């Protein structure tokens, strides 16, 4: 039995609140249960130096957690003067995941930055950031389309979403909360497109190595879960 009482294939309640910020070109407050992340997409009419005069744009991401997003207050990374390794790893993952479904040539020489700020953490912050980040990116592109800058369907090739799965109490489970994640025997994150393409898989055995059969079970849970998330994304943006 999972601590939350959920079934092994049951995700937490997921919701998207679009246009949460009045300033950003695109924004979304995403909730995976008690994990809440504010995702904003900001457009800049510039590209990184290595892309200048190529006609291509760029999509990148930054990630952070508010000091009291967790049970005890954390020091702001800005106060320490540098980002931690975990932060850098997660924001690179978010950027890679979103770029996987963007035609950078069709975007033109512009940069969109996704800022994913964790307001409250209860496991799965990176997967929530990717899934909510897609909504914010979509709304940013719609903002651009309304100003005749691009066509959304030429720039955005597909949906992308992410979910965590793991072995908890010797059972494969989906969408681990913090209590499960902190004591899971295996922890994995899956990023996939709406058409089923695999963008990234991160999997680690915390103690006992996991078998190929267990991995296959996690993969199937993830496929089903991401299918549900993509359906929720479509419902959110199509009204």
Swiss-Prot record:
Gene3D superfamilies: GHMP Kinase, N-terminal domain
InterPro entries per the UniProt record, alphabetical: ExoRNase_PH_dom1, ExoRNase_PH_dom2, ExoRNase_PH_dom2_sf, PNPase/RNase_PH_dom_sf, Ribosomal_Su5_D2-typ_SF, RNase_PH, RNase_PH_bac-type, RNase_PH_CS
Catalytic function, reaction form: tRNA(n+1) + phosphate = tRNA(n) + a ribonucleoside 5'-diphosphate
A Pfam family that the UniProt record links to this protein: RNase_PH_C
Keywords linked to the UniProt accession: Nucleotidyltransferase, RNA-binding, rRNA processing, Transferase, tRNA processing, tRNA-binding
Gene Ontology MF term list: 3'-5'-RNA exonuclease activity; tRNA binding; tRNA nucleotidyltransferase activity
Ligase listed as a keyword: no
The UniProt record lists the keyword Glycosyltransferase: no
NCBIfam families the record matches: RNasePH
Family: Belongs to the RNase PH family.
Stated name of the protein: Ribonuclease PH
The organism of origin for this protein: Rhizobium johnstonii (strain DSM 114642 / LMG 32736 / 3841)
């Amino acid at each position: 039995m999972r601590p939350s009482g959920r079934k092994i294939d049951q995700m937490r309640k997921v919701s998207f609140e679009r246009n949460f910020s009045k300033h950003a070109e695109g924004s979304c407050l995403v909730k995976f249960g008690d994990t809440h992340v504010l995702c904003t997409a900001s457009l800049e009419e510039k590209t990184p130096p290595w892309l200048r005069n190529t006609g291509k744009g760029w999509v990148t991401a930054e990630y952070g957690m508010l000091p009291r997003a967790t049970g005890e207050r954390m020091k702001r990374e800005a106060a320490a003067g540098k980002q931690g390794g975990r932060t850098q790893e997660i924001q690179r993952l978010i950027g890679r995941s979103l770029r996987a479904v963007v035609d950078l040539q069709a975007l033109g020489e512009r940069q969109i930055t996704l800022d994913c700020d964790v307001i409250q953490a209860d496991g799965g912050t990176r997967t929530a950031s990717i899934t909510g980040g897609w909504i914010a990116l979509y709304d940013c592109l719609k903002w651009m389309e309304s100003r005749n800058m691009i066509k959304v369907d030429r720039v955005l090739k597909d949906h992308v979403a992410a979910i965590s799965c793991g072995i908890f109490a010797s059972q494969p489970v989906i969408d681990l909360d913090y209590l499960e994640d902190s004591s899971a025997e295996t922890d994995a994150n899956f990023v996939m497109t709406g058409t089923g393409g695999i963008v990234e898989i991160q999997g680690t055995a915390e103690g006992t190595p996991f078998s190929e059969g267990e991995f296959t079970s996690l993969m199937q849970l993830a496929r089903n879960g991401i299918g549900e998330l993509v359906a929720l994304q479509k419902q959110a943006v199509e009204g």
